[in-house]
Curated annotation (Swiss-Prot):
<dbReference type="Pfam" id="PF04295">
    <property type="entry name" value="GD_AH_second"/>
</dbReference>
<keyword id="KW-0408">Iron</keyword>
<dbReference type="InterPro" id="IPR007392">
    <property type="entry name" value="GD_AH_second"/>
</dbReference>
<dbReference type="InterPro" id="IPR017654">
    <property type="entry name" value="GarD-like"/>
</dbReference>
<comment type="function">
    <text>Catalyzes the dehydration of galactarate to form 5-dehydro-4-deoxy-D-glucarate (5-KDG).</text>
</comment>
<keyword id="KW-0456">Lyase</keyword>
<dbReference type="Pfam" id="PF20629">
    <property type="entry name" value="GD_AH_C"/>
</dbReference>
<protein>
    <recommendedName>
        <fullName>Probable galactarate dehydratase (L-threo-forming)</fullName>
        <ecNumber>4.2.1.42</ecNumber>
    </recommendedName>
</protein>
<dbReference type="GO" id="GO:0046392">
    <property type="term" value="P:galactarate catabolic process"/>
</dbReference>
<dbReference type="GO" id="GO:0019698">
    <property type="term" value="P:D-galacturonate catabolic process"/>
</dbReference>
<dbReference type="InterPro" id="IPR052172">
    <property type="entry name" value="UxaA_altronate/galactarate_dh"/>
</dbReference>
<dbReference type="GO" id="GO:0008867">
    <property type="term" value="F:galactarate dehydratase activity"/>
</dbReference>
<keyword id="KW-0479">Metal-binding</keyword>
<comment type="similarity">
    <text>Belongs to the UxaA family.</text>
</comment>
<dbReference type="InterPro" id="IPR044144">
    <property type="entry name" value="UxaA/GarD_SAF"/>
</dbReference>
<comment type="pathway">
    <text>Carbohydrate acid metabolism; galactarate degradation; D-glycerate from galactarate: step 1/3.</text>
</comment>
<dbReference type="GO" id="GO:0046872">
    <property type="term" value="F:metal ion binding"/>
</dbReference>
Length: 510
């Protein structure tokens, strides 16, 4: 494992668990038919990088095992050394939710990790920011054009006067009107908007731009102070609207500019974990390294969020035993059941996940993807569960229920109070968020070389034996502290690569 494959390209595969009957090819570009491994395995055909090879002969109907779990059944006879293509893998049924073990294997607490801090912005509510941003919230999509024009003016004319303010970020969304505002599920987008407006990186400064006739009243977002609300219909013409927005913004910029970074305990961090453009290496390099870093963060008192219901659902039987109590375990199951029902309403098929890119990277189905995805959660006890759009109010490892969409998940983690996100990718994505730093970790060395000015940390070294999971986990942990302190900038922030917010609205649009 310690060999440098980038120089001599010695053939190598990775078998995760001792009972696995499949392994993935490590070598860049894959390996040709006839390749002989040190164990005597001979490839019966060309196998692409990251794709699975059979370690034993498999008869039709036999279990295909990876991560020590059944990821499918052989649809036909597969000879030892053959490429296990997606078409040869019949997906198993998802775990039944009514008889899962609850809180029966709760990990023992580990010694506290002391002596680590970061330089953050202290807020009046006790939270801390990793950035110092003026966030401007909208109550309805109708005002976006006016706000965008105003933000351009703010950045050009006002922001240079206030060097301690990092940015001005408009919080756009598609909600606010033409929606069933009182439908039961409307609570999800509404509380998401409410919590986004009070994000820790906005320093307690709330500013809401509304139209004046929308269903989502601005008062529901900024309920504490009418001075935080500006209604366009109260103004005589466009110029007056812009002038009022600029004046309202400058009042807040003055206050934000007076803020300075102070030493904060790691317990003030709320770290979101997410993966996008996953591949077969995600579950053996980047995600386990992030999981190791997550354990370090939990030991240091931080809040860590892992998410993506559809990429947890097929591994839920591995999570409910880690719940700190039966109540937390039941909350996990409740979120799975709600999402199962939501998908049935849309007649959605589990086979819709993974994506074509995931499959090209070696993932056969959502079961295999889920088993790799949950590695991000590390090994800590699961101390709580958040519904979509809820704000985190406790420390430790939390499951924040979100869809798997990068953009929806990122938005909901921001609403939970996330002040920095760690994002793993195998295929590569330029994804970023304006409201919080996004630290990107590659699953493969070749991606980190190909996108050297987009990837922050290379976890592909784990696959080649040049670094251990622990090594990269500590690197991620220390980089989180550097980015949170403003000592280091992520590539996404350096280039200004910021995706739009995307609300999760399961309620009807009228």
């Amino acid at each position: 494992m310690a060999m440098n494959l980038r120089k001599n390209q010695a053939p190598l595969y990775i078998k995760v668990h001792e009972i696995d009957n499949t392994a993935i090819i490590v070598n860049d570009g894959g390996l040709p038919k006839g390749t002989v491994f040190s164990c005597g395995l001979v490839l019966e055909e060309d196998v692409p990088q990251g794709h699975k090879v059979a370690l034993t002969d498999l008869n039709q109907g036999d279990e295909i095992v990876r991560y020590g779990e059944v990821i499918g059944f052989a649809d036909e006879t597969i000879k030892r050394g053959s490429w296990i293509r997606e078409a040869l893998v019949r997906m198993p049924a998802p775990p039944a939710l009514d008889d899962l073990p609850l809180a029966n294997r709760v990990p023992q607490p580990r010694p506290p990790l002391e002596g680590y801090t970061f330089e953050g912005y202290r807020n009046a509510d006790g939270s801390a920011g990793t950035k110092n941003i003026l966030g401007i919230t909208t109550s309805v999509q109708c005002v976006v054009g006016v706000l965008d024009y105003a933000v351009k003016r703010i950045k050009e004319e006002l922001l240079p006067k206030y060097p301690n303010v990092d940015d001005v970020v408009p919080l756009h969304h598609q909600y606010g009107c033409g929606v069933a505002i009182n439908a039961p599920d409307a609570v999800i987008p509404i509380r998401t908007i409410q919590n986004l407006a009070k994000h820790p990186n906005f320093g307690g400064e709330v500013m809401v731009i509304g139209l004046g006739c929308e269903k989502l009243l601005p008062e529901r977002i900024a309920s504490e102070n009418d001075d935080d609300i500006l209604s366009l219909q109260d103004h005589r013409g466009f110029a007056a609207m812009i002038q009022s927005i600029l004046e309202m913004a400058e009042e807040r910029l003055i206050r934000l500019n007076s803020r300075t970074r102070v030493s904060c305990p790691v317990s003030d961090l709320v770290i979101g974990l997410q993966c996008g453009g996953s591949d077969a290496f995600s579950g053996v390099t980047a995600n386990p390294a992030v999981g190791y870093a997550a354990d370090l963060l939990v030991r240091a008192g931080a809040t860590v969020l892992f998410s993506e219901v559809t990429e947890v659902r097929d591994a839920i039987h591995l999570l409910t035993p880690r719940a700190v109590s039966e109540e937390v375990g039941q909350s996990l199951i409740k979120e799975m059941k709600w999402y199962d029902s939501y998908l049935r309403r849309g007649d959605a098929d589990r086979s819709a996940n993974p994506s074509p890119g995931n499959k090209k990277g070696g993932l056969s189905n959502v079961v295999e993807k889920a088993l790799g995805s949950v590695a991000k959660s590390g090994t800590s006890p699961i101390s709580g569960v958040l519904g979509p759009g809820e704000r985190a109010k406790q420390k430790g490892l939390l499951f924040a229920a979100t869809p798997a969409s990068d953009f929806v998940c990122g938005t909901l983690q921001l609403a939970a109070g996330m002040n920095l996100q760690v994002f793993t990718t195998g295929r590569g994505t330029p994804y970023g968020l304006a409201a919080a730093p996004v630290l990107k970790v590659s699953t493969r060395h070749s991606l980190s070389e190909h996108w050297a000015d987009l990837i922050d940390i290379n976890a592909g070294r784990i696959a080649t034996g040049e670094a251990s999971i622990e090594d990269v986990g500590w690197e991620i942990f220390r980089t989180i502290l550097d980015v949170a302190s403003g000592r280091k900038q992520t590539w996404a922030d350096r280039w200004g690569l910021h995706n739009d917010l995307c609300l999760f609205n399961p309620a009807p649009v009228t």
